[in-house]
Amino acid sequence: MSFARRPNRSFRPRSLASLMTILVCFCLALSRTVAGETSSAGTEPAFTGLRVDGKAVSGRITAITADRITLDSDENAKEEVPFRFLVKLARDPRLPTQTPEGSHVLLPEGDRLMRVIVGATTDTGVEVQSQSALGKLTIPLECVLGLILTAPTESDAFDQLWNRVAGETRPTEVVWMANGDRLTGGFLGLDDRAVKLQIDGKPVEIDRTGVVAVGFDPTVVSYPRHDSSYLDLTLADGSRLGVTDARVERGQVVATARFGQPIRVPIGDLIRLDPRSDAVVYLSDRKVDAQDNSGYFGAPRPLRVDRTVDGHGFQLGGHTYDRGLGTQSQTLLAYRLKPGDRRFQALVGVDDRAGPLGSVVFRVLTDRKPRVTTPPMSSRDAPLAIDIDISEAKLLILITEFGERGDVRDLADWVEARIIR
């Protein structure tokens, strides 16, 4: 990450950070006791899910192995569901939005740790104390895209900062200051007092209280991916981690995070599990082969991956989603299909943020043949699920067209757009 070569020193958190950690842990334990959030064996929540064939599945998670999940229904019936047959399991489709409270660690591919205390950070690793059951974690710095240390309280400003830290191309480390300044240099570390950079060959200490965020060079970020199946776990605080070697022990999911640290999460703290296998491929992970954008008024806005076209998380019908394609009418996206691609599935609609003015028509074509055409949709309309056979097709085309008012507030969402293989 453009690291300057310095002696390997540990910047230990001082008394203030230690006191904050103790207070957070005490408040977390108290809130869980009051709210009764901590689950014990036999009281785990029920999850509902979606299989790749479109059928629903539900039950309490009782076992996880390398390639399947076991669910117990209310009728005490056990069902083993292989990862490759399952799209998702969710306790509540209203995934938590990314909130400005606290500090946040941004990892590649949408993984993140929300509402943490960032402690000692060197040019090799960062120590964080999570307010969730994840507790204390040490993350290799090569796995980190950035740190939001002091988040803006206004949601639009927070999303803009998040997008810069997560998606900006930068050849070196960047420090964003509360006064609007932007500093670049080689990262040396941070503690509870200062962020340390090497600027023009000289070490510089920057008062941490004035630092909003730190972004690392994304070209040298390395995030291990398992050779076969793994799980994405989403927690109630909005954190999401990819994990391997998952299993269930006494009402907890025990696993290894993709950055190598063992974790334990009570099932009651999980709100969603996404099996990641080669059977379900999200279009946000596939390169679009061709796209065309033509606005009605002003300059068109191109496709955004895993964000709405104006840079926010997806919200459809009051529900929040992590993955998808954000477009604006009029947009055409073309994907060359691969041998083994069987079905295309997505949830489409106009994002809740569009308000009453947005109006969009969604169309799906295969090999230029119309397969789906929706009526004009606004944010007041319920999202529509699309599920079509593409096994004989070579080209998948997704189109958003002008509805009733040109492209005014046309925030067109293709939520969880995916190929079933």
Regions found by a protein language model. Name each.
Residues 17-32:
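Bacterial N-terminal signal peptides
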Residues 48-49, 393:
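Long alpha-helical scaffolds
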Residues 41-45, 51-280, 335-336:
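Extended non-catalytic domains of envelope/secretory-pathway proteins
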Residues 6, 236-240, 343:
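Short, solvent-exposed linear motifs at loop/edge-of-secondary-structure regions
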Residues 208-231, 249-421:
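Gly-Asp-aromatic-enriched flexible segments
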Residues 1-14:
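N-terminal secretory signal peptides that target proteins for export/translocation
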Residues 33-38:
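Boundary at the C-terminal end of the N-terminal hydrophobic targeting segment
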